[in-house]
Structure formats: structure tokens, C-alpha cells
């Protein structure tokens, strides 16, 4: 079966998944009430290493689970720990590389991969060990839409054809809810509502498009696919047609250029990530950067921010004059361009939320409480004494966004800002 776990950020989805292989409470601390039994083994008395042959887990941050240097070695590592013979390992490595569409990455260094590529490698490393239960915490959060569909299709095939049990937490429900056999909803009060997806989604506080349509139409259950929704609606000759978009789109720019990029290039050895890009961005506008995993989106953002070595020029209209943030001092550069990276936790290093907020206020030279106020405007309430490492990926992302916005930068760069 494929079980889907849903709930808002911070409701305990990752904690619940952590109980399935003993990470909670053996490594997380806390008190576990009740029992979790996996293949006849009680997770309270069996540590994660004693469950590794039956439960495979891919967390929200794949890099945190890597232990080797290259893709091929990482996929083989888990099988080595389980004592699988070399001949079987070689066969499984090849099969998994093909299944996940990463055969061309086999000899690449893990740290040289994009976030989406790393996510696919992490899933491949777990699948190669052929666990009986696969636990995935937001497995498509860093994947482009095509890659996400490919990965979910592969997982669904394993469920239906091989009998693999998959428990999956996901925010983008429209991608996977049609394939789910059961759904667990975490309202945030510590309880878990279980049932059939179409029944639970009808009352859950997470509302994918089809659930929103269901509520408007007054349907008792939620259609799990567009095809099913169309069947329910049936012919409605009295309904007005949706307005058709005009051929000519009107550009609503701010009129004031804030960013100029001139022949910007980024190269890693013989690999060209960004090739002589020239563009401008106007103040008060939102620019969407799209591309497949590994196409250079993050490289471009880091180059604009100044952390990645690049050629060409980057100019920001800061306080009435044009300057290159790559050549400015740290404080000025932060007020010119701020970047929220894919791995938001990389920017968090203090032991509490309060200290992170206070440090951001100090570095941004703004009144005390500014960062905390921004966090509240993001509708994320975090206890001041909470350690960022104990928070969910989404909560850490919100905290980093508040920290970066505290300096009121001219340009804000967001790399996969909806993870978690």
C-alpha cells in the first residue's frame, strides 16, 4: 500500500515518520508512548540499525544522510552494511541508477549535484537495499515537475508490482493523492486522522485544488483526479465559459531597474552552468526562474549573490547608485542581495530562535524585535527557546527567510522556497 501523510508545517509529520525506524526516540530524545511494531520488531527495543533491513528512510534533507563521496558509492553503501554479496550489489546499483534516471551521474561527486539530483540519489540509495517499507519525507520537494512525476511513477510501480509498502509525507498532494491507498492527516493537536484519501481530504485543513473544488461543489468526498472530477460535474450547459486569455499579455513592471546582469558566466571545470547571461529585473516585480534539475538555477542565484566565482558583471541599484554586490563589504552586500538557499539550515548556527533573531537584528542594524516581527507576519509562531535543529524543514525555512528579510534587501533570491 501507499500511505500519504499530510498536515501543515510543524504538525509533526517528520516526527511521526521518525518513529517507524526508531530514530524517534533513540536519537531524537523525548518520550514515546504506545508501541510501533515493524515486521514484528518493537522500535522501542530495536535500534535503527536493527531495523535497517526492513525500513528505508529518506529525510527532508538528503545531504544529511550521505556518508560517501560519489553517487555509485552512496547507492552501494547501504547494501554493504547489510552484507549483500558484491555480485548482487552490482546488479542492484545498475537497476536503481536506471530506475531513478541518474545513470549519467554515477561517478559524480555528491556535493557537486543540484538539490534535485541529490534527492534522487538519496531515494536510489534506499531503494537499492530493497527494504520492505519505504519512508519518504517530502521526496519531490527539490525536483522539477517532470522529475517529480518520474520518481512518483517509479515508486507507484514498486508498490503495485513488487508489493513495496510506502509511507510518504508530501505537501504537493495533487501529485500523489490519486495513487494513495490511505491517508493520515495531522491536524496539529497531536492526533492523527486516518482513512480513505477522498474522505479525509474532505475535512482536512490542507486543501489541494481538487479538495477546494469539492467544497465549492458541496461533494461529500474529494475526487482524486481531474478525470473523476469531470465525471462528477457532468455536462453543465448553464455554466459560463472561463474567460480566455488575450493573445497580448500586458507587462506590469515597476519601471525602475534594480538588477542588471551582464554576460554572467559560471563554470565548474569543463562544465558550463551559466553561459553569458544578460538580463535586467525591475523593482517591485517577481521573476520566476525555471529549469530542469541540474540546469544551473542555483548556480545563477549564488553568482548574483556573490558566493560563487563568476565572470561578467552584476549590478544592483542600491540607494540611488549602481554597485556590484560581489565587491561590497558583507553588511552592504546583505542590504543589496539576500539569498535563501535550498538547505536553509546552513544559515542557522545559534542554539535558539531568539538568538538567531537577535543576531539578525544586530547584523542588519535594525531595531530589536524586527526579525521576530517579520516571522510573525509570515504566520509562523516559533517558541523563542526552540533550537532550530529541532524544527521542521519548513519552520527553519521560515526563520531563515525572516533573517534575510530583516536587512530590507533590494533583491531577494529564493531557491526552492516551498520545501517543508
Residues covered by each model-derived region:
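Hydrophobic anchor residue at the start of the ABC signature
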Residues: 121-123, 151, 401
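ABC ATPase C-loop
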Residues: 126-127, 405
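Conserved beta-strand-loop-alpha-helix hinge in the C-terminal portion
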Residues: 186-223
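Conserved ABC ATPase "signature" region
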Residues: 87-105, 366-384, 394, 400-402
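ABC ATPase NBD Q-loop/coupling interface
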Residues: 24, 35-50, 313-332
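Conserved ABC ATPase signature
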Residues: 109-113, 117, 387-391, 395
Amino acid at each position: 500500500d501507499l500511505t500519504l501523510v499530510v498536515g501543515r508545517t510543524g504538525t509533526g509529520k517528520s516526527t511521526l515518520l521518525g518513529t517507524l525506524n526508531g530514530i524517534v526516540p533513540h536519537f531524537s530524545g523525548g518520550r514515546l508512548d504506545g508501541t510501533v511494531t515493524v515486521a514484528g520488531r518493537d522500535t522501542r527495543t530495536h535500534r535503527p540499525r536493527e531495523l535497517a533491513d526492513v525500513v528505508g528512510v529518506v529525510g527532508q534533507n538528503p545531504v544529511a544522510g550521505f556518508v560517501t563521496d560519489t553517487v555509485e558509492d552512496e547507492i552501494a553503501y547501504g547494501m554493504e552494511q547489510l552484507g549483500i554479496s558484491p555480485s548482487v550489489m552490482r546488479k542492484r546499483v545498475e537497476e536503481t541508477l536506471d530506475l531513478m534516471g541518474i545513470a549519467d551521474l554515477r561517478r559524480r561527486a555528491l556535493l557537486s549535484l543540484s538539490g534535485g539530483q541529490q534527492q534522487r540519489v538519496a531515494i536510489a540509495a534506499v531503494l537499492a537495499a530493497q527494504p520492505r517499507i519505504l519512508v519518504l519525507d517530502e521526496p519531490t520537494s527539490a525536483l522539477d515537475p517532470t522529475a517529480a512525476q518520474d520518481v512518483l511513477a517509479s515508486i507507484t510501480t514498486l508498490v503495485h508490482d513488487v508489493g513495496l509498502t510506502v509511507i510518504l509525507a508530501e505537501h504537493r498532494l495533487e501529485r500523489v493523492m490519486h495513487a494513495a491507498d490511505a491517508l493520515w492527516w495531522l491536524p496539529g493537536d497531536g492526533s492523527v486522522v486516518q482513512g480513505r484519501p477522498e474522505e479525509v481530504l474532505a475535512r482536512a485543513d490542507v486543501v489541494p485544488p481538487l479538495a477546494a473544488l469539492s467544497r465549492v461543489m458541496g461533494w461529500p468526498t474529494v475526487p482524486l483526479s481531474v478525470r473523476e472530477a469531470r465525471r462528477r460535474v457532468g455536462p453543465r450547459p448553464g455554466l459560463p465559459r472561463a474567460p480566455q486569455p488575450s493573445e497580448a499579455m500586458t507587462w506590469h513592471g515597476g519601471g525602475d531597474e534594480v538588477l542588471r546582469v551582464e554576460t554572467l558566466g559560471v563554470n565548474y571545470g569543463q562544465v558550463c552552468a551559466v553561459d553569458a547571461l544578460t538580463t535586467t529585473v525591475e523593482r517591485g516585480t517577481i521573476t520566476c526562474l525555471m529549469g530542469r534539475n541540474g540546469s544551473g538555477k542555483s548556480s545563477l542565484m549564488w553568482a548574483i549573490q556573490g558566493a560563487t566565482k563568476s565572470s561578467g558583471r552584476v549590478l544592483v541599484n542600491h540607494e540611488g547608485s549602481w554597485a556590484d554586490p560581489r565587491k561590497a563589504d558583507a553588511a552592504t552586500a546583505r542590504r543589496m542581495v539576500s539569498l535563501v538557499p535550498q538547505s536553509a539550515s546552513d544559515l542557522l548556527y545559534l542554539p535558539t530562535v531568539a538568538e538567531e533573531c537577535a543576531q539578525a537584528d544586530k547584523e542588519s542594524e535594525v531595531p530589536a524585535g524586527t526579525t521576530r516581527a517579520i516571522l510573525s507576519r509570515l504566520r509562523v509562531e516559533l517558541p523563542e527557546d526552540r533550537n532550530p535543529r529541532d524544527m521542521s524543514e519548513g519552520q527553519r525555512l521560515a526563520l531563515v527567510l525572516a533573517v534575510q528579510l530583516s536587512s530590507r534587501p533590494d533583491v531577494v533570491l529564493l531557491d526552492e522556497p516551498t520545501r517543508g
